[in-house]
A protein has these predicted regions:
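Broad hydrophobic/π-residue packing in well-ordered secondary structure
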Residues: 1, 5-6, 26, 115, ...
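Fold-level signature of zinc-dependent metallopeptidase catalytic domains
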Residues: 1-20
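A broad, low-specificity signal marking well-ordered, structured residues that form hydrophobic/aromatic
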Residues: 3-5, 52, 94, 131
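Pocket-edge structural micro-motifs
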Residues: 7-9, 56, 98, 135
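Metzincin-family zinc-dependent endopeptidase catalytic domain
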Residues: 16-114, 120
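Metalloprotease/metallohydrolase-associated module, dominated by Zn2+-dependent proteases
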Residues: 81-108, 124-158
Length: 158
């Protein structure tokens, strides 16, 4: 099943390229990492078709990106005490603070796009620096999803 992502036109072409590459590196993994995932995510220009919306916005000091989950009709779903959703969601908003992102290396800007998309697909934080799901502030050096990140996707989606 195809899932779609949408990019708000407030992003520069540079950030649009970061987002597109981040998505591609989650989807096209067999040749590069030897792990095949069942996910298919394609870009759409029709926001109503999208389940992953990339938005530009201002976040709290030091926060690079934030993913929020919604039910149809716009109801925001809150995370429980364990940081998990207690209900299924219909779509996710991935908000990126480009002014804060501009203070980190370019490769980590793209990695942050991939990190937030990982959340939108259901992954939580890891403290392993080689995982895309490690926060930049916790020492992330990954530039794309690792084999273990992809195996976690396979666990969720197969």
């Amino acid at each position: 099943t195809n899932r779609y992502y949408w990019i708000h036109n407030a992003f520069s072409s540079t950030y649009e390229a970061y987002i597109k590459k981040a998505v591609s590196q989650w989807v096209h993994t067999t040749d590069s990492l030897g792990v095949t995932t069942p996910i298919s995510i394609k870009k759409t220009s029709t926001r109503s078709k999208s389940v992953f919306d990339f938005l530009k916005g201002t976040l709290d000091v030091g926060v690079l990106g934030q993913t929020s989950f919604y039910k149809h009709g716009g109801t925001l779903l809150k995370l429980n005490k364990k940081g998990a959703l207690s209900k299924n969601y219909s779509y996710a908003y991935i908000k990126l603070d480009t002014s804060t992102l501009n203070s980190i290396p370019a490769a980590q800007r793209q990695a942050t796009c991939a990190h937030e998309l990982g959340h939108a697909m259901g992954l939580s934080h890891h403290m392993i620096s080689s995982s895309i799901m490690c926060q930049y502030g916790d020492g992330r050096n990954a530039k794309r999803a690792s084999k273990n990140d992809l195996k976690a996707i396979n666990h969720l989606y197969k």
